[in-house]
Amino acid sequence: MSGSKPDILWAPHHVDRFVVGDSELSLYHIESAASPGSELKAGSLRLSEETIATLLAINSDTPYMKCVAWYPKYDPECLLAVGQANGRVVLTSLGQDHNSKCKDLIGKEFVPKHARQCNTLAWNPLDSNWLAAGLDKHRADFSVLIWDISSKYTPEVAVPTEKVRLAPGDSETCSVVTKPLYELGQNDACLSLCWLPRDQKLLLAGMHRNLAIFDLRNTNQKIFVNTKAAQGVTVDPHFHDRVASFFEGQVAIWDLRKFEKPVLTLTEQPKPLTKVAWCPTRTGLLATLTRDSNIIRLYDMQHTPTPIGDETEPTIIERSVQPCDNYIASFAWHPTSQNRMVVVTPNRSMSDFTVFERISLAWSPTTSLMWACSRQLYECTEEGKGSSSLDQDIATKMRLRALSRYGLDTEQVWRNHMLAGNDDPQLKSLWYTLHFMKQYAEDIDQKSSGNKGSLVYAGIKAITKSSVGTTESFRHSWTCSDRQADIVHYSSEERWLALQLCGWRTKGADADMGPFLNSLEQEGEWERAAAIALFNRDIRRAIQILNKGASTGKGNLNLNVVAMALSGYTDEKNSLWREMCSTLRLQLNNPYLCVMFAFLTSEPGLYDGVLYENSMAVRDRVAFACLFLNDSQLSRYIDKLTNEMKEAGNLEGILLTGLTKDGVDLIESYVDRTGDVQTASYCMLQGSPSDVLKDERVQYWIESYRNLLDAWRFWHKRAEFDIHRSKLDPSSKPLAQVFVSCNFCGKSISYSCSSVPHQGRGFSQYGVSGSPTKSKFTSCPGCRKPLPRCALCLINMGNPVSSSPGASKSDEKVDLSKEKKVAKFNNWFTWCHNCRHGGHAGHMLSWFKDHSECPVSACSCKCMQLDTTGNLVPAENVQP
């Protein structure tokens, strides 16, 4: 290393010691600093804010150093081999106390026949007496010499006495060895060396134009590959078959199991490389250094599964680090500290540097959060109040709702809100609206020959606009009351339908509110029931409901006060009753109690106190408007309320917009606000098939929800959703993805075998129906060639079989007696897309439960391993 840049070596068995060598060898001890700003002791260097290095010893007795290697065993602990410019290898030490064994080795020299530069040294990690040296080319000598350091002094004529270098001390104890244990690599230069850890007799050498693996058990043979990347060969300590080497600005990664070509080539900067080194504490992390650079480039080789037989390069994540501002002469990884290295500059300035680990974050579909940093794996857990926030996350809600089959009840549609937890008023309003729409659309379609049922799904906004010009006004008196004042009501067929959608009316022309009010009383909605009774001119029933609500165990005492106030109602404008009710209204918290007084104290046609009470349910406000507003007032109010619902994304507004484009706009605002693509998908599928389902937004919500179910591994739930979707929207039924055709004539077997031609695309048609009345198709209907045989039972495909090849014939008869429209899954055709072998699905499943290879003899295809999802199981039954 004389006249060259310094290099660093860590002690193999002392993680706090390292050597820096150039023209001399310096041994340092690294330790933690007392404090960042403390003064340094004499002979100490600050490497970082946390560490300092103290000089322990210096050895300047070995000039013309070109390479250094540290003895791999613990004893002797500070024995080093130094390769010199004349090809000699000298054993030396760093001023430590030595036992007799070490004293016999120190100063020992290993001299080649012909002098030339020693480029590299490598101790055998298993048999530590073997030391390999790589020399420059000589036409009459070998370039790879393996010395046995335990060899005795055997002087030869070829080594003149005056040329033998003696180490300091008694010359009688010094020795020179000139006979190497092995000589390899004739007529070529050796640039780098390393022993292969898997076998102590294998040596990898980077020669001038090739990489060669020498087996010391048979030195006449070698494995080699031609390449220019012969410098700096180094074995990955975590993967002994992976080797790195370099040439100029390129790094080659080799797999010794397939040594014909590099598995990966890394192109560096235009400047030539000076060093590459594998990280000893991290798998697949390679560091490289270029000449005259202050940057160390890191290559993180990711281990990703690839299909069998694919020759794909490993995924590489590249990054650069800058340990210091000056040019870096060399670096060395710390042998035990994670991602830690020491770098040295040409002027011997050193720095202790830690490469901060990339944090890999993983957020599972079930909201579990984990991340990896260094050798640690962390999991984020919720404690205390945090768990409630997780429960409120929409993803958690959608997952729980999917488990409860939310949205799939198409008969009693209103029950879906109960499957969602019955804790969201907007969802309750939505599903009741969809229930009423379905109910009355079917009722209208049965009574009329036209397509008026679709008007129901268009919403109340469209319904009320169609009633313009047909509305009649009536003056009605209070029911069961002596009041003389009349109230103006508006009525039409369309307004009646709107009241039905709001839930205020039932089927037929009967206007009896009794059942509806009774249901509200059962749910404890006393205030709402009383208000609706009052709006329908039944003040006596309203008072009775309030008194009944006040008498219950959890009744509100304000109900009695309101009931007493209602009993004194008078239509005189300047009465004391109106003045007191206006004051009382401001003191009430319940919106329905407030609107009752607002209604009674309002002028005819001026009901803003009721219509714009935002705490009141939208369906009740709309129903009230349909009763008491004329056509122009109703149209303006519905338009204004619809726009408010669309902007807020309030699901109660579906009553107004229906499942139209306005409804899609409203749902879009709702999804933007909540992320609930589940409700959006089921909602838009409820309506009769229309162009709305072709809207890109609707399709996006549906596909997003399907992807969510797949991510949760709810494959059965996703299949149920697809079936539900195809029933409500037949146009969404996908076309066949696979069909069976004859190898001889090319005609589709599925079309010919199907009893219903237009159903021939279904995959289930590839089996045999369970009905005993159907024919068995064991040959192609087109050319009469026999169908392939099952690889296990050897029966032609098309024959019904039992679930296992060894089952009795009686089992087959029992199976055939079951009348089904589609073939059982066990009878379906199935085959490997790689080797094309297959058979009955039931037999294949049974075989691959215990085997990984194809059941066909002489076929080594790993059929089951080709399916990356084969080992995954559904998670429908796993609670979050």
From Swiss-Prot:
Coiled-coil boundaries: none
Gene Ontology BP annotations: cellular response to amino acid starvation; cellular response to nutrient levels; positive regulation of TORC1 signaling
Principal location: membrane
Alphabetic keyword roster: Lysosome, Membrane, Metal-binding, Repeat, WD repeat, Zinc, Zinc-finger
Binding site for Zn(2+) 4: 835, 837, 854, 859
Chain positions recorded as Zn(2+) 2 binding sites: 793, 840, 843
MF term (GO), any: zinc ion binding
UniProt record similarity statement: Belongs to the WD repeat mio family.
Stated name of the protein: GATOR2 complex protein MIOS-B
Organism: Xenopus laevis (African clawed frog)
Name of encoding gene: mios-b
